[in-house]
Design a protein with these regions (language model features):
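Bacterial N-terminal signal peptides that target proteins for export
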Residues: 2-10
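Extended, solvent-exposed, non-transmembrane regions
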Residues: 25-202
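Bacterial N-terminal signal peptides
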Residues: 10-20
Length: 202
């Protein structure tokens, strides 16, 4: 091999070893997400309604809906909808219900909706979430929602958490779950409009 051909061969090896394409293949973003319109456990009943199921790590789009539900004495609602998706540098989830009534009207609302998102920027993860409630009434009292994790005590040893948010952003990984309403009590656990989003940035 002459000197010219040797130089060309060395250049080709350098291109293959230091190619940006090889580096790009390692920079993989993975996603997580799930949205559930109504999750309830009470008196031997277990419900997961309008549940998207978990989003694959590769991302994609999942959605589900239900016209109405009525479990006597426990929960009734209309227009249950849930979506979760992941692509590019972000994942998002959303869930909503209308005409909600829980525990015979102890908790009621015209519209209940939650949203969450997780994004990557410069290799770092960030998460955001929000709950929207229209016409929320608990034990006959109108409730205005502002900050997350508003706790309200109700009769019968029942507690209500409004705009419940739990998040764990840490470096290149982040996850957040927003439960628009969470009712807990003796043998009762009800979550309305839950939206979880997560991401790992590489």
């Amino acid at each position: 091999m002459n000197a010219k051909n040797s130089t060309i061969a060395i250049c080709l090896i350098a291109i293959l070893v230091f190619s940006p394409v090889a580096s790009f293949a390692q920079a993989t973003i993975t996603f997580s997400g799930e949205a559930v319109a109504l999750r309830a456990k009470a008196l031997g009943i277990s419900l997961d309604l309008s549940d998207t199921g978990p989003l694959p790590a590769r991302g994609g789009n999942l959605s589900t809906s239900l016209a109405s539900v009525n479990v006597l004495g426990l929960a009734s609602a209309d227009a249950l909808k849930s979506t979760t998706s992941g692509s590019g540098t972000s994942s998002q989830s959303q869930s909503s219900v209308a005409s909600l009534s829980l525990l015979g009207g102890l908790v009621a609302a015209d519209v209940v909706k939650s949203t969450s998102s997780a994004t990557c920027s410069n290799g770092q993860a960030a998460v955001t979430g929000n709950a929207e409630l229209v016409g929320l009434v608990a034990a006959g009292q109108s409730i205005l929602v502002s900050n997350p994790n508003l706790a309200i005590s109700l009769p019968g040893g029942i507690s209500l958490i409004v705009n419940e948010q739990t998040s764990s952003p840490s470096g290149n990984t982040g996850s957040i779950t927003v439960n628009a309403l969470h009712v807990k009590g003796p043998s009762i656990d009800i979550v309305v409009a839950s939206a979880q989003s997560g991401i790992t940035c590489s």
